[in-house]
Regions:
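N-terminally biased helix-coil "hinge/interface" segments that flank
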Residues: 1-510
Length: 510
C-alpha cells in the first residue's frame, strides 16, 4: 500500500529480512510504498532482490538500506566458516577457558557451547609485547613464512596477540604475512583495540566466523540490487556502508532488531511519548528493549554463547513468535517454542505443508486473523487444515479445541511477559511509566494482554506494525563508533595531552 509523506523525492529502499517474512519500504517522490514477501532462508538474497523488483517496476536511482539476519543465523545455526586463530604461543586456549561465570550455576554437569575455533585450528606463534606495548620478544620471520602453510586449510583467519591495543605492530606484521593467502582476515587491533584478551579474542573469532557468508551475501546484494549505495543496519542503531559490513560483520549481529527499536522510538516520539518498551514479535522470536527517552546500549552481549564486545542496543530475545511450534511434552505439559515453523513450511494455516501447530494457527482457529486479509489478500489462510491437529492436541490435554488454542497463546504470552519483566522490573523500572509499543507481524495480537499483565497503562500499535523494523532503517543515522584502550595514570604530567591526542586520532579514524 502507499501513503503520502513529507520526505524528499530521493528514492530510498529499506529492506528488513526476518525469519519468516522480508519487509520492504520504498520512499520515492514523497510516497511511501510497502511490501511484505516470504523470506527465502536457503538463499536470503533472493527474497530481497525479488521484492525489490516488485517495488522498483522500472530502473531508477536509489539507495538501499538493509537489516539482515544472515550473521545472526550463521552463529545460531553454527553454519559459519572454518576459522584458524593465530595467537601468542601458550595462549591458544584463552577462547575456550573464558571467564569463571557459568550460565548453569547449579547444574551437576555444566554444558557450555563449544568455541567457534576448534583446538587444532588455534595456532600459537612466538613474539610478545608487554602491557604498555613494549616489545619483549620479536617475531620470527622464519616462523611467519612457515605459518602460511599451517593455516592454508582455513576459510577465514583471525589474528589476536596480547596487548595489541597498546601496540599493533606485531598483529599488522602477521596480517601482512597472511594477506597473500587471499582469505578473509580479522585483526583484533583493527576490530576491537581494547584490553581483556578473552572478549577481544571471542569478538574477533565471531567476526571471522561469519565473514565469508556475509561477504558472499552482501557482495551479491551490492552487485545485483542496482542501488547507487548500500548501507547496512548496525547493531548499535546506526547505518554503516556495505564495505564496512563486509569487513566487520560482527557489527550486524543484531541488525534487524536494532531497526525495530529505532523505528518504534521514532513513531512514539511523533505521538508524544519518549519512554517506551518495545515489543517486536515476529514469526520466529520476540525482541524486547527498554528506551527511557533513547535506546540503551551495552557492550556485554552474548550470542550463541559467544561474547561480543561491540556496542549494541540492549535487546532481550525469547524464542516465541507467530511460527513457534506447540507440543505436549513427556510430562503432559503444553510447550510453545523455541522451535519455529519459519517461512517454509510455515504454520499449518498457510497451506504450504506445515503439520505442526503454531501460535499463528491458534489465532486463526479462534477467529482473530481474517482468512482473506493475509499478506494484503495475496494469500488466504486455511482454517480447515487446523481442525485435525488442534483436536488431537486438545484430546491429549483433556480440553476443547478452543481451550487448547487459548492455552497455546497463554504459554507464549507467559514467555514474552517474562522477557518484558527482565528488561523493566528486574532493572528497577516501573512499566506503568512506559508505553508498550507493539510491532512485528504478531505484536498487535498480544500487546493488550501483555500490557495488562505488566501493569502498563498505555499500549501503542504504529501504522504497518509488521514493517516497522524496515521503517527504522529509514530513520537510522549513519554512524561510526570507535574505541581504544588507553592505560594511563591520573598523575601523569602529560595526561591531558595524551587524551587530546587520542581523541583526535579517534575522530580522524571515524
Amino acid at each position: 500500500m502507499s501513503s503520502a509523506t513529507d520526505h524528499t523525492s530521493t528514492a530510498i529502499l529499506a529492506v528488513d529480512t526476518g525469519g519468516t517474512f522480508t519487509d520492504l519500504l520504498l520512499l520515492a517522490d514523497g510516497v511511501l510504498t510497502t511490501l511484505k514477501v516470504p523470506s527465502t532462508p536457503a538463499d536470503p538474497a533472493e527474497a530481497v532482490l525479488a521484492g525489490s523488483r516488485k517495488l522498483l517496476t522500472e530502473p531508477r536511482p536509489h539507495r538501499l538500506l538493509h537489516g539482515s539476519t544472515v550473521a545472526t543465523n550463521g552463529l545460531l545455526e553454527r553454519k559459519g566458516a572454518q576459522v584458524v586463530l593465530v595467537t601468542n604461543r601458550g595462549f591458544e586456549d584463552v577462547v575456550e577457558i573464558g571467564r569463571q561465570n557459568r550460565p548453569q550455576l547449579y547444574a551437576l554437569v555444566g554444558h557450555r557451547p563449544p568455541p567457534l575455533v576448534a583446538r587444532e585450528d588455534r595456532v600459537g606463534i612466538g613474539g610478545r609485547l608487554g602491557s604498555e606495548g613494549e616489545e619483549i620478544e620479536a617475531l620470527s620471520e622464519d616462523e611467519l613464512s612457515a605459518l602460511r602453510d599451517r593455516v592454508s586449510h582455513a576459510e577465514a583467519l583471525a589474528v589476536v596477540l596480547l596487548h595489541s591495543y597498546a601496540n599493533n605492530h606485531h598483529e599488522e606484521r602477521v596480517a601482512e604475512s597472511l594477506q597473500e593467502l587471499g582469505l578473509p582476515l580479522s585483526v583484533s587491533s583493527r576490530l576491537l583495540p581494547e584490553y581483556r584478551e578473552y572478549e577481544r579474542t571471542s569478538t574477533t573469532a565471531v567476526n571471522a566466523y561469519v565473514s565469508p557468508i556475509m561477504s558472499r551475501y552482501l557482495s551479491r546484494l551490492d552487485a545485483e540490487s542496482g542501488a547507487e549505495a548500500v548501507h547496512i543496519m548496525a547493531s548499535n542503531g546506526g547505518a554503516v556502508p556495505v564495505e564496512r559490513a563486509i569487513r566487520e560483520p560482527v557489527h550486524t549481529v543484531l541488525s534487524g532488531p536494532a531497526g525495530g527499536v529505532v523505528g518504534a522510538l521514532a513513531w512514539a516520539k511523533r505521538s508524544g511519548f519518549d519512554q517506551i518498551i518495545t515489543f517486536d514479535m515476529g514469526g520466529t522470536s520476540t525482541d524486547v528493549s527498554l528506551c527511557p527517552g533513547r535506546p540503551l546500549h551495552t557492550r556485554e552481549f552474548e550470542i550463541a554463547g559467544q561474547p561480543v564486545a561491540v556496542p549494541v542496543i540492549d535487546i532481550h530475545t525469547v524464542g516465541a513468535g507467530g511460527g513457534s511450534l506447540a507440543r505436549v511434552d513427556a510430562g503432559g505439559a503444553l510447550r510453545v517454542g523455541p522451535e519455529s515453523a519459519g517461512a517454509d513450511p510455515g504454520p499449518i494455516a498457510y497451506g504450504m505443508g506445515g503439520r505442526e501447530l503454531t501460535v499463528t494457527d491458534a489465532h486463526v482457529w479462534l477467529g482473530r486473523l481474517p482468512a482473506e486479509a493475509f499478506l494484503g489478500g495475496e494469500r488466504a489462510l486455511k482454517k480447515a487444515l487446523i481442525e485435525e491437529p488442534i483436536e488431537a492436541l486438545a484430546e491429549s490435554l483433556g480440553k476443547t479445541p478452543s481451550e487448547a488454542a487459548e492455552g497455546i497463546l497463554a504459554v507464549a504470552n507467559t514467555a514474552m511477559e517474562r522477557a518484558l519483566r527482565v528488561i523493566s522490573v528486574e532493572r528497577g523500572f516501573d512499566p506503568e511509566e512506559f508505553v508498550l509499543v507493539a510491532f512485528g507481524g504478531a505484536g498487535a495480537l498480544h500487546v493488550v494482554e501483555l500490557a495488562e499483565r505488566l501493569g502498563a497503562k498505555r499500549a501503542m500499535v504504529p501504522p504497518d506494525p509488521g514493517l516497522l523494523s524496515a521503517y527504522g532503517m529509514l530513520a537510522a543515522p549513519p554512524n561510526r563508533e570507535i574505541s581504544r584502550t588507553l592505560l594511563i595514570s591520573s598523575r601523569d604530567l602529560d595526561l591531558e595531552m595524551r587524551l587530546e591526542t587520542t581523541f583526535r586520532e579517534l575522530e580522524a579514524q571515524a
